Curated annotation (Swiss-Prot):
Molecular function in Gene Ontology: small ribosomal subunit rRNA binding; structural constituent of ribosome
PANTHER family: 30S RIBOSOMAL PROTEIN S20, SMALL RIBOSOMAL SUBUNIT PROTEIN BS20C
Disordered, as annotated region: 1-22
Protein origin, superkingdom: Bacteria
Family: Belongs to the bacterial ribosomal protein bS20 family.
Family annotation (Gene3D superfamilies): Ribosomal protein S20
GO biological process, one term: translation
Keywords carried by this UniProt record: Ribonucleoprotein, Ribosomal protein, RNA-binding, rRNA-binding
The protein's name: Small ribosomal subunit protein bS20
GO cellular component, one term: small ribosomal subunit
Pfam families per UniProt: Ribosomal_S20p (PF01649)
Length: 87
């Protein structure tokens, strides 16, 4: 364990950031899962609304630095392509 005051502070900050990042990543997984479930059920309207929510969550996570912006763009692109293919 850290002995210096500054090292203790940095450790506490890193734990707080890790918890926040974990929550954001879990949220990303859940919104992507919502889109995929709607796609499996062939529900275009529900998939479209879930896609809007997923893209918002992914863009926000990318802007905060939780995920790389290209990763977010790739996931949004693939989900959009899948939603557009549903007849």
């Amino acid at each position: 364990m850290a002995n210096h005051k500054s090292a203790l502070k940095r450790h506490k900050q890193s734990l707080k950031r890790a918890a926040r990042n974990r929550a954001v990543r879990t949220r990303i997984k859940n919104v992507i899962k919502d889109v995929r479930i709607a796609l499996q059920q062939q529900d275009k309207e529900q998939a479209a609304t879930a896609l809007v929510q997923a893209s918002a969550v992914l863009d926000k996570a990318a802007s905060k630095g939780v995920v790389h912006w290209k990763t977010a763009a790739r996931k949004i692109s693939r989900l959009t392509k899948a939603v557009n293919q549903v007849a």
